[in-house]
């Protein structure tokens, strides 16, 4: 029995762009000697006593089973010849900005999901090009010619299918999913490939005998809702290629933050304050980029024993002034009870964000 009507908007033209092994690709571009070698973005475990995690890695390293969020120690054990690079996140952010400017040539309806991926609605694009596939090819060409990097593209009538399509043929692939092909495309996919279906849901689906899109398609809507609640409603529609979520070019950010984990524990106040300052500068730069001001400053401290303290202060006025944020973050740290254990993580976050007002100038 169908609980809610199925409304499927197939009139849109959506592109999902996903940069190929982005951080590692930037490093290879800037150091051609790395090409063809397994490259891991993360601290070298031989220098950190085995601590640290993999941020990302190139396709050569993935042949050894290395993946993001894996411990650096395990990555080294899988591939002792891997080249570990700590990463230059300011450089990656600059390259990401270049890529976003390329997107904007074609449409202003761009929804960045992270530094290396974004959705574009090109239904009504700036150049009046009718073919979304042609636009995707032009974007791939522009990024390669101007930035020296490859990306994969997925094209379809909604974000869900475009995202799946971009992951279908990597690296440097382009996959189109038409409305008449959607059910066949989804039927063959393992359920864990469905974007938005996490590990816990995958296990639950497997327990129900659901392993592929075809299996999911056969399950009644009410059964899915009984097992998954509101998410069951979404699953029923995703199995049918239905997802009407718009591309949101003005995604609302609830917070902007920066945190760092330290392989070598911090003990000295001067070192701690210096690291707080680095985080603050990163936050201030992000506030500037996103044209945001904030009122609440949050300091996060994690000690060697994994005790984590979070404390916040709300200011009377909006700000994005780095010196002001740093002063408050430093005061918050000074107010914490002394802990002889070294610090392994520091984070600074700005919340209660609002759009920048033209007559406020607090970033001098």
From Swiss-Prot:
Top-level division of the source organism's lineage: Bacteria
Catalytic activity: DNA(n) + a 2'-deoxyribonucleoside 5'-triphosphate = DNA(n+1) + diphosphate
Location relative to the cell: Cytoplasm
Cofactor list: Mg(2+)
Site annotation Substrate discrimination: residues: 23
Chief place where the protein resides: cytoplasm
Disulfides per UniProt: none
Residues annotated as domain UmuC: 14-198
UniProt-listed Gene3D superfamilies: 3.30.70.270, 3.40.1170.60, 5' to 3' exonuclease, C-terminal subdomain, DNA polymerase, Y-family, little finger domain
Entry's cofactor comment: Binds 2 magnesium ions per subunit.
The keyword DNA-binding is annotated on this UniProt entry: yes
EC number annotated for this UniProt entry: 2.7.7.7
Catalytic residues as annotated in Swiss-Prot or TrEMBL: 117
Gene Ontology biological process: DNA-templated DNA replication; error-prone translesion synthesis; SOS response
One term under GO cellular component: cytosol
InterPro entries: DNA/RNA_pol_sf (IPR043502), DNA_pol_Y-fam_lit_finger_sf (IPR036775), DNA_pol_Y-fam_little_finger (IPR017961), DNA_polymerase-Y (IPR050116), DNApol_IV (IPR022880), PolY_HhH_motif (IPR024728), Rev_trsase/Diguanyl_cyclase (IPR043128), UmuC (IPR001126)
Keyword Mitochondrion on entry: no
Quaternary structure and partners: Monomer.
Function per UniProt: Poorly processive, error-prone DNA polymerase involved in untargeted mutagenesis. Copies undamaged DNA at stalled replication forks, which arise in vivo from mismatched or misaligned primer ends. These misaligned primers can be extended by PolIV. Exhibits no 3'-5' exonuclease (proofreading) activity. May be involved in translesional synthesis, in conjunction with the beta clamp from PolIII.
Family: Belongs to the DNA polymerase type-Y family.
Protein's name according to its UniProt entry: DNA polymerase IV
Organism: Streptococcus pyogenes serotype M1
Taxon lineage: Bacteria, Bacillati, Bacillota, Bacilli, Lactobacillales
Gene giving rise to this polypeptide: dinB
């Amino acid at each position: 029995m169908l609980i809610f009507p199925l409304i499927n908007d197939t009139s849109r033209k959506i592109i999902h762009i996903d940069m190929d092994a982005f951080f590692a690709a930037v490093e290879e571009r800037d150091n051609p000697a790395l090409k063809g070698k397994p490259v891991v973005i993360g601290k070298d475990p031989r220098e950190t006593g085995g601590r640290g995690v993999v941020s990302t890695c190139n396709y050569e390293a993935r042949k050894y089973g290395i993946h993001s969020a894996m411990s650096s120690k395990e990555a080294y054990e899988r591939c002792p010849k891997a080249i570990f690079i700590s990463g230059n996140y300011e450089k990656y952010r600059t390259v990401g900005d270049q890529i976003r400017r390329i997107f904007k040539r074609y449409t202003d309806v761009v929804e960045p999901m992270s530094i290396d991926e974004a959705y574009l609605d090109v239904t009504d694009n700036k150049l009046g090009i009718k073919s979304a596939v042609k636009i995707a090819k032009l974007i791939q060409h522009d990024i390669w010619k101007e930035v020296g990097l490859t990306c994969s593209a997925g094209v379809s009538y909604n974000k869900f299918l475009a995202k799946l399509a971009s992951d279908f043929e990597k690296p440097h692939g382009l996959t189109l999913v038409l409305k008449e092909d959607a059910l066949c495309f989804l039927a063959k996919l393992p359920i864990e490939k469905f974007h938005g279906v996490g590990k816990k849901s995958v296990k639950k689906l497997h327990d129900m005998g659901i392993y592929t899109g075809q299996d999911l398609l056969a399950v009644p809507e009410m059964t899915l809702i009984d097992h998954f609640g509101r998410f069951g409603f979404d699953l029923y529609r995703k199995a049918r290629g239905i997802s009407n979520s718009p591309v949101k070019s003005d995604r609302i950010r609830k917070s902007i933050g920066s945190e760092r984990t330290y392989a070598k524990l911090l003990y000295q106040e001067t070192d701690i304050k210096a690291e707080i300052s680095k985080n603050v500068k990163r936050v201030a730069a992000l506030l500037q980029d996103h044209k945001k001001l904030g009122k609440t400053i949050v300091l996060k401290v994690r000690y060697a024993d994994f005790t984590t303290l979070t404390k916040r202060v709300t200011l009377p006025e909006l700000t994005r002034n780095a010196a002001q944020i740093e002063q408050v973050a430093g005061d918050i740290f000074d107010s914490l009870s002394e802990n002889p254990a070294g610090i392994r993580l520091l984070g600074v976050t700005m919340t209660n964000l609002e759009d920048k007002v033209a007559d406020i100038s607090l970033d001098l």
